[in-house]
């Protein structure tokens, strides 16, 4: 382990480095178990031609486009759906659903995939061995494998080649007490105001009030995973 100017570089394999930043959240501090962070997405508002959430997520986390759509990292992808009976079209953002009972955690052989006390599902890049069992287990195809060398590392979002990763619900923002994820912020500013982020356990939060008033559906609710991302209009 080499350290310089408050930044540590940990070699996990030849040519693969992960960065530890001195201003990172102390991993020994527990997440708040009284909260469960989640998202509500109104597909009636989501526009097929709008990619504000995707672009904001990529910028926030240093995700680059290498021109390989089948293997490039995607934390959010837009799905364009057509109802077979009515022909109605929907465009929905798909990301990690932050399940209460995440299959990715169950199959991980090293414990790299884990769920925090506040419901956010994460990957520890230091212990991920890139086996991709979690990718196969995820029914939402929400995880990506990092194939490329990374040149756009950001202080709050350390990433590693040869690791699997997915939406973190902007955990670096959550741990700083911020109220919006990059995608929800961008959707409100540049999009259709279709994404609400908040505490599902707080009955007074905007997301809870909206769910209580209009409801919301989990994708593949039949799996019993109790996802923290819910959708309206599907």
Q: Positions of the model-derived regions?
A:
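Non-ligating segments of multi-cofactor redox enzymes
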Residues: 1-234
